[in-house]
């Protein structure tokens, strides 16, 4: 074991032992899929939108009720399974890393959003959905938002994807930084830096250097080629290219003897929401967010229609979901969540996301599911459906652990959900900021609870990344998510209904989780930003711990912020 990280694992276990909480290691996922062994393996398509709210779709109580009809996703839900207790992560990069790797983001180091020019990204040692499925004979394709780094080794075509087309590397608003019409007060030297380091839409096959197809900016412009050279495509038009790449790939591979896996990632509905001109004013509410929601729904519908048209729908598993909870900090250019908290918090509003699974003839129509599932479970589930065993070593030959459960028994009605818990992490948390076991939730990280008044008699706004860091002093808040999904009533100590006894369960689960960090240490963070000062006394205490560990042969870097 690498001594540099072994020390971190020991400290993690110690911290986990001190916190009241709980967890379990992921189950062994070796089951074969539901299809006949002699039949062609199913195609698998993962469609991910960005920042879509839990309450935006009609099937979740939104749709026309929110002034933004979603007939295509609602049809997908009516023909498949809708999940009501599905979890992403509190922000885009960890949410996408969790889906792609099947690992808690702090294990891969993909814990927070990076800015352009920072380099790095998803470690080359990690397995992805694509690299695992390729071991089972799948062709693999990626298009749209990646957000897992900009170094060549971290790009989709170096992470198991045979081909990538029109890949966006950053959060959507990053493409406005260099635009003087957006930020006329920006220092010219800083603007020049953003112009220089921001990579545009990338395409390329595995083993090839990526090609920049066009630049991306925050204007209503669609000139991908100018005088035979790369041009510029504005944010409003980007998802046109993602849809086109998807439809072209389906056309080209519909009759292939090999199964395929597609990862399709729309930029909608991340702020700034700038709808394609074809969809401006097409929602009932006429807002930019609602128009963008109608656009995203239509593009998903076009992909689903193509599957039916090509006659491959009966042998294709499609999963649609989003990366994280609604970003209430940027209201009104944001999705809606009925839950407490927002993107960037350990509250339900930060991580609970909409999700739909569809496979005609395999998944029962109009299924409604309330089991604990999440984006982490895609890895084990897709591997199971494809008849593949998950690897026990990473791509560099070192032992690896997944936190992914095979939920195919849930999809196909053949068994119960193997997952009984969920752990919530924000940014660089090594131990969970919150934990759910069954229908009870313990909250240790109170970020987002001190929102500023929005005016009049309005409720407090939810401050996610903008809010102060705050942890409970000794005991967590306890919520019953069946009776109180909005986390309004702390039942830890409240007269005869007190639930202090739940600490035993949470302690057991979190301690079990943290023990795995000793055997499988986390990778170093792949992106870090200054998050505030540390005090001299904190620095001195850490220095003393560091010196003691050095005597035992362990190395720890000094901290730079809280």
Language model regions located:
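Formylglycine-dependent sulfatase
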Residues: 3-18, 22-472, 476, 485-508, ...
